[in-house]
Every structure is written in C-alpha cells, then in structure tokens.
C-alpha cells in the first residue's frame, strides 16, 4: 500500500507516464486506485508524430499493469518522508 499512498499524494500534479509499449504520456494525475491504475487529464503524447491518434484525446485511463515508469519532478518527492514510510512498512510486515 506504500506506492498507492505515495501516488495519492501526487494527485493534481503533472507527471509523465511511460507505458510498456514505449508511449510516453504527459498529463495531470487526477486519480489512482489500489491497482495503481491512473487517470490523467489534459494529456499530450511526447511523440505525436508517431502516435497521431492520441492528439485528440484529452483524458485517459491507464491500467496499472501497462505502466513501465512514472517520471516525477524532483521537488514533488519528500525523500525523507518516503524513507521513513518505507521503514515503517517493513517493520509492520515483520511483526
């Protein structure tokens, strides 16, 4: 649940999602669920010449299992808080 909690803190932030089929989609994260499915608004494809059919799409739902990577702005992540949360989760799993 750590990643779910982490991504919920990124709602209304701009992210770039790289899919397993090499498509990169930039947009505003609107929601995330426990399966790490993502809903993005105001999207744009980073390579619109290669994927022209995405040019007219503004909102998209991305299944979590198709995501390869999510690019974040460095200042969007509090690394100390993330490290502490990771340690707490490991400690609760050991009990």
Curated annotation (Swiss-Prot):
Domain Sm residue range list: 2-76
Q: How does it assemble?
A: Component of the heptameric LSM1-LSM7 complex that forms a seven-membered ring structure with a donut shape. The LSm subunits are arranged in the order LSM1, LSM2, LSM3, LSM6, LSM5, LSM7 and LSM4. Except for LSM1, where a C-terminal helix crosses the ring structure to form additional interactions with LSM3 and LSM6, each subunit interacts only with its two neighboring subunits. The LSM1-LSM7 complex interacts with PAT1; within the complex PAT1 has direct interactions with LSM2 and LSM3. The LSM1-LSM7 complex interacts with XRN1.
**Outcome of mutating residue 35 to A, per the record?**
Strongly reduces affinity for poly-U RNA ends
Q: Which family does it belong to?
A: Belongs to the snRNP Sm proteins family.
- Entry protein name: LSM complex subunit LSM2
Q: One GO molecular function term?
A: RNA binding
An additional note in the Swiss-Prot or TrEMBL entry is:
Present with 2210 molecules/cell in log phase SD medium.
Supply the PROSITE patterns for this chain.
SM
The record's InterPro entries line, in alphabetical order, gives: LSM_dom_sf, Sm, Sm_dom_euk/arc, U6_snRNA_Lsm2
Against SUPFAM superfamilies, the record matches this protein to: Sm-like ribonucleoproteins
Where is it located? Nucleus, Nucleolus; Cytoplasm
What does the record say mutating residue 63 to A does? Strongly reduces affinity for poly-U RNA ends
Q: Output the PANTHER family linked to this UniProt entry.
A: SNRNP CORE PROTEIN FAMILY MEMBER, U6 SNRNA-ASSOCIATED SM-LIKE PROTEIN LSM2
């Amino acid at each position: 649940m750590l990643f779910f909690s982490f991504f919920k803190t990124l709602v209304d932030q701009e992210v770039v999602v790289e899919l397993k089929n090499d498509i990169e989609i930039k947009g505003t994260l609107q929601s995330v669920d426990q399966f790490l499915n993502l809903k993005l608004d105001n999207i744009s494809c980073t390579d619109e010449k290669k994927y022209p059919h995405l040019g007219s799409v503004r909102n998209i739902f991305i299944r979590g299992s198709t995501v390869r990577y999510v690019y974040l702005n460095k200042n969007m992540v509090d690394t100390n808080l993330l490290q502490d949360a990771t340690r707490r989760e490991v400690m609760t799993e050991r009990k």
